[in-house]
Amino acid sequence: MPLQVSDYSWQQTKTAVFLSLPLKGVCVRDTDVFCTENYLKVNFPPFLFEAFLYAPIDDESSKAKIGNDTIVFTLYKKEAAMWETLSVTGVDKEMMQRIREKSILQAQERAKEATEAKAAAKREDQKYALSVMMKIEEEERKKIEDMKENERIKATKELEAWKEYQRKAEEQKKIQREEKLCQKEKQIKEERKKIKYKSLTRNLASRNLAPKGRNSENIFTEKLKEDSIPAPRSVGSIKINFTPRVFPTALRESQVAEEEEWLHKQAEARRAMNTDIAELCDLKEEEKNPEWLKDKGNKLFATENYLAAINAYNLAIRLNNKMPLLYLNRAACHLKLKNLHKAIEDSSKALELLMPPVTDNANARMKAHVRRGTAFCQLELYVEGLQDYEAALKIDPSNKIVQIDAEKIRNVIQGTELKS
């Protein structure tokens, strides 16, 4: 049972109470202070001090100071008045117990409110930090978008300047062709004049030298007419023998039928042009060429202007949808822009057009499998991605980069199976 402490001293003013309590040699670490508006308890085993205060105090602003083996309390009164005693008198045990329980409940409520207030303040801080981070990210995103827009404007200006240069060059060539044509027409006219003049001179000479007979005059006239008309050109034929294309494949591994089919498909793809597009009337001749558009898209891809590159490939595909490299290159752009489903579609379309599989299209088929596999892996479809990588390795087993990536995908799949 703890020993009650009674050797304390206290003083007061109308607004505060000053209480001095000796610790009796007890370590400060072992001292526990509990204070509410009507109750003060100091527990420093084996001693105990309790005070059922005469009037309510402001326990939040009140304070305690420990020093020189003594605790000095400064208790601020809620109402300015002088107390008759420090503790209320005439309190029985039941009343004391009720005051203790009420004080504990008040302390618990206050602690709960403080915890909730702290949690609310923490949430506000987190909300503020999140808003600041979102603002920073938005500014960074806007900065990146501005950079992209500037690059797009720059590329557009360069493209327009290049178009203007091509237009002027084409106009210059047209003027030169017209000048040459005019010169040729002048030369032809002069030649005709000379021939006409020679014919006229020859005709006059024949008339002067010919006999006066009617029949002889007709004979010479007919002869002059025949001489004035040039003889028709002789007809000839030119034989052309084309050199057949031969694939560098060993005879035991030869795929003559497939190779011929591939060559036939390539020739058809080059001839397949869709000119029934409304926008074609505003384009120049070189802009209507899918090969030119493909090269332009490749240059834009190299400058990381992926949206402009996609636009170039789109127009090229509208002009000729049988060229597999257009789909293959557009799939690479979609991968860069994280348009993963579109990358899968374009890679699959490229693989359809790269049939039958021959040595000439092996590299393109390998790239199509790798790009589709990459898109599958970024969609976390690792099994499908591994299948494409293994297909790429069947085409090019010595490709170290594809081998390393395929091994990484296998490790991811095995790790997922172990976790499940």
Swiss-Prot record:
What are the CS domain coordinates in residue numbering? 3-87
Q: Where is this region: Mediates interaction with ESR1 and STUB1?
A: 7-103
> Which Pfam families does the entry mention?
CS
Entry's Gene Ontology molecular function annotations: nuclear estrogen receptor binding
What keywords is this UniProt entry annotated with? Cell projection, Cytoplasm, Neurogenesis, Nucleus, Repeat, TPR repeat
Of the GO CC terms on this record, one is:
extracellular region
Q: Where in the cell is it found?
A: Nucleus; Cytoplasm; Cell projection, Neuron projection; Dynein axonemal particle
In the record for this protein, the TPR repeats are positioned at 290-323, 324-357, 366-399
Biological process terms from the Gene Ontology for this record are: cilium movement; determination of left/right symmetry; epithelial cilium movement involved in extracellular fluid movement; establishment of localization in cell; heart development; inner dynein arm assembly; learning or memory; neuron migration
Gene3D superfamilies to which the protein is assigned, alphabetical: 2.60.40.790, Tetratricopeptide repeat domain (1.25.40.10)
Asked if Glycoprotein is a keyword of the record, the answer is no
**Does Iron-sulfur count among this protein's keywords?**
no
Subunit-level organization = Interacts with ZMYND10. Interacts with STUB1. Interacts with ESR1 and ESR2. Interacts with DNAAF2. Interacts with CCT3, CCT4, CCT5 and CCT8. Interacts with DNAAF6/PIH1D3.
The role this protein plays is: Involved in neuronal migration during development of the cerebral neocortex. May regulate the stability and proteasomal degradation of the estrogen receptors that play an important role in neuronal differentiation, survival and plasticity. Axonemal dynein assembly factor required for ciliary motility.
What protein does this entry describe?
Dynein axonemal assembly factor 4
Organism encoding this protein: Pan paniscus
| Gene for this chain | DNAAF4
